[in-house]
Curated annotation (Swiss-Prot):
It is a multi-pass membrane protein. The keyword Transferase does not apply. InterPro entries: 7TM_GPCR_serpentine_rcpt_Srd (IPR019421), Nematode_rcpt-like_delta (IPR050920). It is found in: Membrane. The lineage of its organism: Eukaryota, Metazoa, Ecdysozoa, Nematoda, Chromadorea. The keyword Cell membrane does not apply. This is Serpentine receptor class delta-7. Belongs to the nematode receptor-like protein srd family. It comes from Caenorhabditis elegans.
Length: 318
């Protein structure tokens, strides 16, 4: 009989390795190929790519599923973190979750930055760096609280035999939480689901406000800068759909509470490995300097684009 775990392990491995490569490449472009008009913003982009790399590396090390029973959650790891024991696997899991929440906060900061540039002026690099640190605080609290969480690994393994006696989990690393209403797992759950939902709403509100400002009032920048800002907005508009992908994971999480099924248990993590692959692709497609660099790599010359002042309206209206 086919073991479904091999399918999900393969999906996880391919997507996380692909995500590492794509994000490292975009990080290189953001550092060395960003035009002056978006060089300050590239600081946020660099942080996003490095956060995505962290999510991909930890995801590759985990290869995890979640088994739920009442107030308890069991995390079963199939990845290389198992070589260093349960404690290491759990800390990797804590890092994995905090990378994803921080990436969402950085996405929110991206929209705040674009709106601020339109209504005032571009902030200094120092202000932007401080902003990145501030939005990291909620995810840092989540990481520290989870790493300091105490757990009895023998008790968790015994619980797994009671909850899912039909599963053969011999030799696998089992961590988790006996009561997710304790501070660390509950804070993580609220941060991943409720606060992330509010961030997603804020992102879509900001996107609409940015479009209204640019279309109705115009932007006091040069023609070339207007085009670059419009391209960035197309990128951010694509990224605004990213939080929706996370909620497929929430759906599988809820289904996993109702039915004990390995497909639901593995599928909780599939959306979280898809997101770091999709988010950088938008920059390759919509930001002309990056797109031209990639086109030149593969075709020997960039695609010719006509830049003019009227192209901004159709670009931001999609």
């Amino acid at each position: 009989m086919f073991d479904i775990s091999f399918l999900f392990i393969g999906i996880n491995s391919i997507l996380t390795l692909l995500g590492c490569f794509i994000n490292l490449f975009l990080c290189y472009l953001a550092i060395f190929q960003s035009p002056k008009a978006i060089r300050t913003y590239s600081l946020v982009l660099i942080n996003i790519t490095l956060t995505n790399v962290g999510a991909c590396v930890t995801g590759f090390l985990l290869d995890q599923r979640i088994i739920q029973s009442g107030k308890s959650m069991l995390y079963v790891s199939y990845g290389y973190c198992s070589l260093l024991g349960e404690g290491f696997c759990f800390n990797i899991f804590a890092a994995y979750l905090h990378f994803h929440t921080h990436a969402l906060w950085l996405l929110f900061l991206s929209f705040v930055y674009r709106y601020y540039v339109i209504i005032r002026q571009e902030p200094t690099k120092k202000v932007l760096q401080i902003s990145v640190v501030i939005v990291y605080i909620p995810s840092l609290i989540q990481l520290i609280s989870m790493c300091l969480q105490e757990m009895n690994f023998d008790e968790l393994r015994s619980l797994s035999k009671e909850v899912v006696p039909q599963y053969n989990l011999t030799g696998l690393t089992i961590t988790g939480s006996l009561d997710f209403f304790t501070f660390a797992p509950f804070y993580c759950l609220v941060h991943m689901a409720i606060i992330s939902f509010l961030i997603a709403i804020g992102i879509h509100i900001l996107r609409k406000m940015i479009i209204n400002r640019m279309v109705l009032n115009g932007v006091d920048v040069t023609i070339r800068s207007r085009n670059l800002h419009a391209q960035l907005l197309r990128t951010l508009s694509f990224k605004a759909t990213v939080p929706i992908i996370y909620y497929f994971g929430c759906i599988f999480f809820i289904l996993g509470r109702i039915w004990i099924n390995p497909i639901f248990e593995f599928s909780i993590f599939v959306p979280t490995v898809i997101v770091p692959v999709l988010t950088p692709l938008s920059a390759f497609i919509h930001v002309a300097p990056y797109r031209d660099f990639v086109s030149k790599m593969f075709h020997g010359r960039p695609k010719n684009k006509t830049v003019n002042s009227i192209c901004i309206i159709p670009i931001i209206s999609h």
